């Protein structure tokens, strides 16, 4: 089937932090349109594809994206008009070649990705198919286990917690709907616990709380308390996941990590994590070490990778070259997938496929600067990834993804699968 792209256009819109981002629209020959908004991260890996910002301090404090919009309207549009909307790999290859840089810094990953996503949406809309079915085919049926970021620290919060995300993982349920309900009930229980203890319960970028607690371990204890008080069983129905984002507390010059006010070597930090894993129902740890500390990842995965999902985010930046190295070294047993780290839909799908073929799990993830766009909800089901990270149970740019997954689960009906603990196929539990 050949359906021509007849128009490609972009505009500057706002993300959930009130910063500009790129929205693209792709129009097909019969008038069908696909639209997409790209997200933006706060803690970014240094190997990520680069978004372009205007750096004009008089507009949006330098964060405008008019240059990226111009790149879509004046460079990308002429190249894609006349192309087949159903040839996503060729569209994305054209975008990559048009840019010509390793990290998409000429046209901007924000310009390229907005168009790549919009093309996929337009093609799905033309066929009258839901996006997950267009991208994933008839076998797209697995609803993801949500990793819900309910306590924020690190670069996502102005508090004294080093680790960036403390998540609840409702994996012990039979449907996505039940898992979501458990997450919401725990979230509200947690709010009550924090409020009664005198903590501020305002929420951060991803909808989680950012209390000043005495240590990272105290944050885990508070989560366990919330799970129990909400009427659920920690370690059976609901588990804990951590995103350490360790690059943010690593001193490159000294080669040490700063955790709980102390200097720690990779080896000492490893011991610290092992103690936490022994004491609490921690099922997943993301970026426990800095993005170039490969040896520590390899050793840690060797030690605890049979019982804990070790996830590479900044380590891999959704890049198949870095992922290949990780697979070869057995550096992790899981990868975090972010569309805007790599910059096209095809490259994202390639990374998921490579991980899954090598018995690694893939977690489809949002960014801290999100929008009402629900592309990643469909992507999680399209790839049967089994996991999604899309924030807490508040802020509508987060709940938009959960609501889309509820719709998809309902639409799939009896075919829908929520694998729960079985989604953790890279570990033996």
From Swiss-Prot:
Mg(2+) binds at residues 243, 286, 313. CDD domains: enolase (cd03313). Its cofactor is Mg(2+). It catalyses: (2R)-2-phosphoglycerate = phosphoenolpyruvate + H2O. Its EC number is 4.2.1.11. SMART domains: Enolase_C, Enolase_N. GO terms for biological process: glycolytic process. The active site is at residues 206, 338. GO terms for cellular component: cell surface; extracellular region; phosphopyruvate hydratase complex. It is found in: Cytoplasm; Secreted; Cell surface. Its main location: cytoplasm. GO terms for molecular function: magnesium ion binding; phosphopyruvate hydratase activity. Pathway: Carbohydrate degradation; glycolysis; pyruvate from D-glyceraldehyde 3-phosphate: step 4/5. Keywords: Cytoplasm, Glycolysis, Lyase, Magnesium, Metal-binding, Secreted. NCBIfam families: eno. Catalyzes the reversible conversion of 2-phosphoglycerate (2-PG) into phosphoenolpyruvate (PEP). It is essential for the degradation of carbohydrates via glycolysis. Belongs to the enolase family. This is Enolase.
